[in-house]
């Protein structure tokens, strides 16, 4: 079995758009947290539908020589292909397997590389980070954003959410079966430093599974956050738990139903952490 976790599939644009809205809201409206100034060449790895890349290009359309490459993941049997972004002249899409050597980038140095939501899709993060570091110009920045793997609570209410706990347990088993490291996202900062990045920083934010919180900021992002988490659970169940663990469709539906029931229970104060790591290439 392919060791990548869950491949993107056709028809996932709705998910990509929801994911984009979620991360931008969790960044208080910012497209990125890295302190990037006047980038001339930007690379968005694993772009999906290209929502982040096109918005980035639109926001910075007045800046000179801004190029945004948005790469799709996966096995590209036809090699590398290029296409322009829709109505965004400074955005170019490249269909290539980002886990292969980046021969198409040999003549360019990049000012900013953006990675979002790729934990579980990459065979070797050390190899990817090595390519990223080599491709950045001196002073260039990398930003990686993703969600933590486990559901959390601060008040012990998660102990009453057996559906969510069971879903997490099966998700961990699925990751182990596929050779993936559980909790890898929490170690990305250390991996960036090992790859040569400096000034590495980590930012986390709680993202609620429902609108249970009285905190103003948590409530403002609750609807987007809850919708994304539910879609994540459904995708993991159908594309991960069932084929990888060889569970029956009835079993998967039961596990998912119990998890969603707990997710919608406002007495269970559950959340997941959004992680963002930034680092600079100084030499």
Curated annotation (Swiss-Prot):
SUPFAM superfamilies: S-adenosyl-L-methionine-dependent methyltransferases. It holds the Pfam family Methyltransf_23. It catalyses: campesine A + S-adenosyl-L-methionine = campesine B + S-adenosyl-L-homocysteine + H(+). GO terms for biological process: alkaloid metabolic process; methylation. Keywords: Alkaloid metabolism, Methyltransferase, S-adenosyl-L-methionine, Transferase. Pathway: Alkaloid biosynthesis. It comes from the Eukaryota. Its EC number is 2.1.1.-. Campesine G features good insecticidal activity against the global honeybee pest Galleria mellonella, which supports its future application in the development of biopesticides. GO terms for molecular function: methyltransferase activity. Methyltransferase; part of the gene cluster that mediates the biosynthesis of campesine G, a dimeric indole piperazine alkaloid that shows good insecticidal activity Galleria mellonella. Within the pathway, cpsF methylates campesine A at N13 of piperazine ring to produce campesine B. The non-canonical non-ribosomal peptide synthetase cpsA catalyzes the first steps of the pathway by producing L-tryptophanal and L-valinal from their respective amino-acids. These products condensate spontaneously to form trypyl-valyl pyrazine also known as didehydrocampesine A. Belongs to the methyltransferase superfamily. LaeA methyltransferase family. This is Methyltransferase cpsF.
